């Protein structure tokens, strides 16, 4: 739920899964709302929606612990079906040690309900491996508005990673 005070102003990009849960972006209005915190990503059963992420709020790390970095832009989101499935989204953060090289990341709500970062640009898959420079996923299926791909009902996300040495790899990232 959003804190007392702000109200929904505009809704964007609602998605629905087979369990009847929803996820959507919404712009907020009311006391204390400004450009830096006006957009939030909400999700859950319609009767018990919760705020998953909001511009200006602290973004979590891989363990789900809040960091000094804050959400700065939401790029795309999806809502897989299946037991324990939660929202998956691509977003940018800023501040708290975030740089232009590591601001883009993939976040997901895990089977226990914890929001955590799964992967971000400038991560390496091996100790001496090249850094990831680009993540491509959650793109719309051509001609099917509101239909994304890159995820399944068993907690896996597929993505295309581009590395600093210009190589690419198809990766499967499992949501814990």
What are these regions (language model features)?
Residues 1-176:
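Conserved "turn/edge" positions that cap or connect secondary-structure elements
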């Amino acid at each position: 739920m959003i804190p007392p005070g702000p109200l929904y102003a505009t809704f964007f990009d609602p998605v629905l899964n087979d369990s009847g849960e929803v996820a959507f972006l919404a712009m907020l209005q009311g006391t204390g709302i400004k450009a830096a915190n006006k957009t939030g990503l909400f999700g859950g059963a319609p009767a018990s929606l919760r705020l998953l992420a909001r511009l200006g709020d602290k973004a979590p790390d891989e363990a789900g612990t809040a960091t000094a970095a804050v959400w700065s832009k939401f790029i795309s989101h999806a809502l897989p079906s299946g037991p324990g499935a939660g929202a998956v989204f691509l977003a940018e953060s800023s501040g708290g040690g975030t740089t232009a090289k590591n601001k883009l990341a993939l976040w997901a709500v895990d089977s226990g309900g914890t929001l955590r970062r799964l992967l971000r640009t400038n991560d390496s898959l091996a100790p001496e491996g090249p850094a990831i420079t680009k993540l491509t996923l959650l793109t719309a299926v051509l001609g099917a508005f509101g239909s994304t791909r890159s995820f399944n009902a068993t907690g896996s996300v597929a993505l295309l990673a581009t590395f600093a040495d210009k190589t690419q790899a198809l990766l499967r990232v499992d949501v814990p």
